[in-house]
Regions:
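Short, charged alpha-helical interaction segments and adjacent helix-coil junctions
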Residues: 2-6, 63-72, 166-288
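Conserved single-residue anchors adjacent to enzymatic active/cofactor-binding motifs
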Residues: 1-204
Length: 288
């Protein structure tokens, strides 16, 4: 079946902002049965924390379970640090004064990278709960967590229920999916939501925009790399010239000292005194 790739932000949001899909995904990855009736996209807070206006691709608040779940999709060079910052921003937004630093809601962030690098793994976690340094036992005091998942790294060792979700996302990247290998209702719903023939004109337009933006970023990276190479070569040439000049000066000074030593020798000065005065070894000025 032909589908739109989940690497596109617009397609990922189209599929995972569906409440049923979002809840099933969170249940399988976090073990939480969310009580929600909507999923927000491009969520941001009225008063940003610090100098960054953090935005959350997909955001849901469950007041009954007292949790916030954010799902982030886009890949950045500062991938791990960026989404740690966003996660902490969601925590800090809840602290109103110095009387109580405990957030009302536990924050969970799931970061999905469809362009994983060789340094990534299928699933990695930052767990904020303190651990006893000696027994390694968790204190069960802080429950905030961040999951970084990379579908490109799914393999036969990836356990369920994670594996089927990761395989679905990975399979979509070449825009072809064999839906017969999937059996979970919510996963089949994702397949249905991203069918090529079900895309709206707005979906297609945004996909083209994202493709153009990605091309531009790659072009800028290539240009920056080229500029860096040229700068490195120029600095190498400049350094070589500078070293050459320094060596030339050193050689000239040594040659001048040698001439002085020879002149002093011709005037009858003792060899030891000439060595002390010029710093030139007698083997050099006694050769002639």
């Amino acid at each position: 079946m032909q589908v739109a790739s989940l690497r596109y932000e617009v397609i990922f949001k189209k599929a995972f902002c569906d409440v049923e899909v979002f809840k099933a995904f969170v249940k399988d990855f976090l073990g939480i049965d969310l009580k929600i009736d909507k999923v927000e996209t491009e969520k941001k807070y009225e008063k940003p924390i610090g100098n960054v206006d953090s935005r959350f691709d997909l955001h849901a608040e469950d007041l009954e379970n007292r949790v916030i779940v954010d799902i982030q999709h886009r890949r950045y060079p500062d991938h791990y640090d960026r989404f740690l910052h966003y996660h902490c921003a969601a925590l800090l937004q809840q602290v109103e004064n110095a009387k109580n630093y405990s957030p009302n809601l536990t924050v969970f962030t799931i970061v999905v990278s469809t362009s994983g690098t060789k340094e990534d793994v299928a699933m990695a976690e930052i767990n904020f709960d303190p651990i006893d340094c000696f027994t390694k036992k968790a204190l069960n005091k802080i429950h905030h967590r961040i999951l970084y998942i990379s579908p490109k790294h799914v393999n036969e060792n990836t356990p369920e229920p994670y594996r089927q979700w990761l395989e679905l996302i990975k399979d979509s990247l070449d825009e072809e999916i064999d839906e017969t290998i999937y059996h979970k209702h919510e996963i089949l719903k994702v397949v249905d939501l991203i069918k090529r023939d079900g895309l709206t004109p707005q979906d297609r337009a945004r996909m083209k925009d994202e493709y153009s933006e990605a091309e531009l970023r790659e072009k800028e990276k290539a240009e920056d790399f080229k500029k860096g190479q040229e700068k490195g070569r120029q600095e190498g040439r400049d350094e070589g010239i500078e070293i050459g000049i320094e060596k030339g000066i050193e050689k000239g000074i040594e040659k001048g000292k040698l001439e002085i030593a020879k002149n002093l020798l011709a005037q009858g000065l003792p060899v030891e005194l000439i060595e002390q005065t010029t710093g030139i070894s007698r083997q050099l000025f006694l050769t002639d």
